[in-house]
Design a protein with these regions (language model features):
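Conserved core of the PLP fold type I
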Residues: 51-169
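N-terminal small-domain helix-loop-helix segment of the aminotransferase-like
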Residues: 1-87, 94
Length: 169
C-alpha cells in the first residue's frame, strides 16, 4: 500500500455533510488502479535492472504522431518535431526558451506553484504576478482585468498558468 488517495480517503472520524463525498485531487497520485498493460510494461522493464536516463523509443514518437492524427487531424508530424521532457518544469523551461528572452516579463498567477517562480528566476525572466481572487465561496478565480492591465503595462508575451482550483500546485 502506497497511495494516500486509496489509504487515507475517507479520513477516519471526519464529518462529511449529507450529499457530499471526498475526492482527492492531487497532481500525481492516482485515484484508480493501474491498467494491466502498464503493469506488464513496468515488469518487463524491471528485467533490464539498469535504471538511468534513456532516449524515447520509436513507439513513444509513433504514439504521439498517431494520437495527433486521430484526435486532432494533424498530418505530416515527424518525430523530429516532437520534444521530450522528463518533467513539468523541464517543459516549462523549454517553452520559456522558445517563446521569451532573458529579461522579459512573464505573467504568473499568485499564489502559484513555487517551482514556476523558481524556473522564471533561474532562467533570467521577470515574474509579474497577477493575484488570484478568492470569491465568497472560497474558490480561487482569475482577475481578468488585472491580467489584461499587466499584459499591456509590462508588454508580456508569455504566461504560466497554474490551475486556479489548485493554485499552489
Amino acid at each position: 500500500k502506497d497511495s494516500s488517495a486509496w489509504e487515507n480517503i475517507p479520513v477516519p472520524n471526519a464529518e462529511i455533510a449529507e450529499g457530499f463525498d471526498r475526492i482527492p485531487m492531487w497532481v500525481a497520485d492516482m485515484n484508480f488502479q493501474t491498467a494491466p498493460s502498464v503493469c506488464e510494461a513496468i515488469t518487463k522493464r524491471l528485467e533490464h535492472q539498469v535504471f538511468g536516463y534513456f532516449n524515447p523509443s520509436e513507439d513513444y514518437y509513433n504514439s504521439i504522431i498517431n494520437w495527433q492524427k486521430v484526435r486532432n487531424g494533424v498530418e505530416g508530424l515527424t518525430k523530429e518535431a516532437i520534444g521530450y521532457e522528463n518533467g513539468v518544469l523541464g517543459g516549462v523551461v523549454a517553452a520559456l526558451q522558445a517563446f521569451s528572452a532573458p529579461g522579459e516579463a512573464i505573467l504568473v498567477h499568485s499564489p502559484t506553484y513555487t517551482g514556476f517562480t523558481s524556473v522564471l528566476n533561474n532562467n533570467g525572466r521577470r515574474a509579474v504576478h497577477t493575484e488570484l481572487k478568492r470569491d465568497a465561496e472560497g474558490i480561487w478565480r482569475m482577475d481578468y482585468e488585472d491580467m489584461e492591465a499587466k499584459i499591456r503595462k509590462y508588454h508580456i508575451h508569455a504566461a504560466i498558468m497554474c490551475s486556479p482550483h489548485n493554485p499552489t500546485g
